[in-house]
């Protein structure tokens, strides 16, 4: 479906992103596509990168972090098979873009960010857009959020060396976790399902994320 000739500015950029970056690469979940066609990615991007807000690559955000490529965001959301009644945990809030998408798809979202400055920025963005079903927490995302578990879906937006046991334990039976696992330089993106208390994993793609720093992630650089 081609973008409407009546669209301009960021609305046109969003429509082109949906058509050329997502639909043409096989994203089919209409709820995911509708959320990404509606939520203003430019609100979560540093001002100088506004012209590239819908470009087909990651963008820098403060403190050496990144906002992921739109296709990877869509791939993760689609793989998670999020239902409207689901409770979701996101690890790695960044400036809040993926949390906003999750808030449009799920009933309740908890998102953890290690950097207090980014967590505060995400809260501002999400409150500005009127979200009331998203809680932003500052902390070690690799440990999850045990006092709110279990979660139907866990999305991890930073790379881990191995599957963190804490996150798997906090996943509901039948739940899905989408997570990049591997070296700091290159990872495999997996969808993990919890069936009869066991981990069943399927590789989706190769990918590259910033490392998740934490007790069950990577150690801080010395």
Curated annotation (Swiss-Prot):
Catalysed conversion reaction: [protein]-L-isoaspartate + S-adenosyl-L-methionine = [protein]-L-isoaspartate alpha-methyl ester + S-adenosyl-L-homocysteine
EC number: 2.1.1.77
GO cellular component: cytoplasm
Gene Ontology annotations of biological process type: methylation; protein modification process; protein repair
Cited PROSITE patterns: PCMT (PS01279)
Gene3D superfamilies referenced in this protein's UniProt entry, alphabetically: Vaccinia Virus protein VP39
Alphabetic keyword roster: Cytoplasm, Methyltransferase, S-adenosyl-L-methionine, Transferase
GO MF, any single term: protein-L-isoaspartate (D-aspartate) O-methyltransferase activity
Domain of life: Bacteria
Catalytic-site annotation from UniProt: 68
Location in or out of the cell: Cytoplasm
Chief location of this protein within or outside the cell: cytoplasm
Family matches, as PANTHER family: PROTEIN-L-ISOASPARTATE O-METHYLTRANSFERASE, PROTEIN-L-ISOASPARTATE(D-ASPARTATE) O-METHYLTRANSFERASE
NCBIfam families xref list: pimt, PRK00312.1
Function: Catalyzes the methyl esterification of L-isoaspartyl residues in peptides and proteins that result from spontaneous decomposition of normal L-aspartyl and L-asparaginyl residues. It plays a role in the repair and/or degradation of damaged proteins.
Family membership noted in the UniProt record: Belongs to the methyltransferase superfamily. L-isoaspartyl/D-aspartyl protein methyltransferase family.
Protein name (Swiss-Prot/TrEMBL): Protein-L-isoaspartate O-methyltransferase
Gene name tied to this protein: pcm
């Amino acid at each position: 479906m081609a973008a409407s000739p009546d669209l301009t500015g960021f609305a046109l950029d969003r429509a082109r992103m949906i058509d050329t970056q997502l639909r043409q690469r096989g994203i089919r979940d209409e709820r995911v596509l509708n959320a990404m066609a509606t939520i203003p990615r430019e609100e979560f991007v540093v001002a100088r990168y506004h012209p590239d807000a819908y470009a087909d690559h990651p963008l820098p955000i403060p403190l050496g972090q990144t906002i992921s490529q739109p296709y990877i965001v869509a791939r993760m959301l689609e793989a998670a098979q999020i239902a409207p009644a689901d409770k979701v945990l996101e690890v790695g809030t960044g400036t809040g873009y993926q949390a906003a998408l999750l808030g449009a798809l799920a009933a309740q979202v908890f998102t953890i960010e290690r950097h207090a400055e980014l967590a505060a920025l995400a809260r501002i963005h999400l409150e500005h857009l009127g979200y009331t079903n998203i809680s932003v927490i500052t902390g070690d995302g690799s440990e999850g959020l045990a006092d709110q578990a279990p979660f139907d879906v866990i999305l991890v937006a930073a790379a881990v060396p191995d599957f963190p046991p804490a996150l798997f334990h906090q996943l509901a039976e039948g739940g899905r976790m989408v997570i990049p696992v591997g070296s700091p330089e290159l990872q495999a993106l997996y969808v993990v399902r919890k069936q009869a208390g066991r981990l069943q994993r399927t590789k989706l793609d190769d990918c590259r994320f910033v490392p998740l720093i934490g007790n069950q992630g990577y150690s801080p650089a010395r």
